[in-house]
Amino acid sequence: MDLHNIRADYTKQQLSKKECDANPMKQFERWLNEAIMAKVNEPTAMNMATVIDGKPTSRIVLLKEVDQQGFIFFTNYQSCKGWAIALNPYVALTFFWPELERSVRVEGIATKLSEQASDDYFASRPYASRIGAWASDQSQVLSSKRTLVAKVALLSAKYPLFVPRPAHWGGYLVQPTKIEFWQGRPSWLHDRICYWLVENEWLKERLSP
């Protein structure tokens, strides 16, 4: 399959180092808000990469909260990503908003949220999602879809109203050490503004495209 001629020229916006906030988390919130306002498809979706024994793997997860501490998501602790983080907490996140010709790359360290924080978020989820957290042995081989459906039925009967949070399910905070903002530009001369955390202070620089 010849894909050589599939390309796009990015012309929508540019990114000035001077106009970027000194705090990359504030800059990220600004861009995320703009993605939401532009009705970007799945603006909170992020590719998360982990590494075990030098072997990287990645998957799409949803950002559920962002603040000055970092990026928060929730998952099954016994999933592949949960085991990976337990062995190596260094992760990378990538957001891609093609409608705005923008991307954000994050490198950081993932740590578990408190049980209270995980309880609070779990309680806010739709009933079916809470049942699903119990029913799914995430990333494990499933004999058939029928087995999963039957398990959901049993759990729904067991928890008709209140569904407690499973101990194997909860949240992570990714505390960033590096954040790069990418804005597509014509002729592949893209704008790249990168922040590094150095002795608890953010250093901001422009990178070559």
Curated annotation (Swiss-Prot):
Keywords: Flavoprotein, FMN, Oxidoreductase, Pyridoxine biosynthesis
Binding locations of substrate: 7-10, 64, 121, 125, 129
EC number: 1.4.3.5
InterPro entries per record: Pyridox_Oxase, Pyridox_Oxase_CS, Pyridox_Oxase_N, Pyridoxamine_oxidase_dimer_C, Split_barrel_FMN-bd
Cofactor note: Binds 1 FMN per subunit.
Listed GO MF terms: FMN binding; pyridoxamine phosphate oxidase activity
Cofactor names: FMN
Membership in a protein family: Belongs to the pyridoxamine 5'-phosphate oxidase family.
NCBIfam families named among the record's database cross-references: pdxH (TIGR00558), PRK05679.1 (NF004231)
Subunit structure: Homodimer.
Function: Catalyzes the oxidation of either pyridoxine 5'-phosphate (PNP) or pyridoxamine 5'-phosphate (PMP) into pyridoxal 5'-phosphate (PLP).
Protein name, UniProt field: Pyridoxine/pyridoxamine 5'-phosphate oxidase
Organism: Haemophilus ducreyi (strain 35000HP / ATCC 700724)
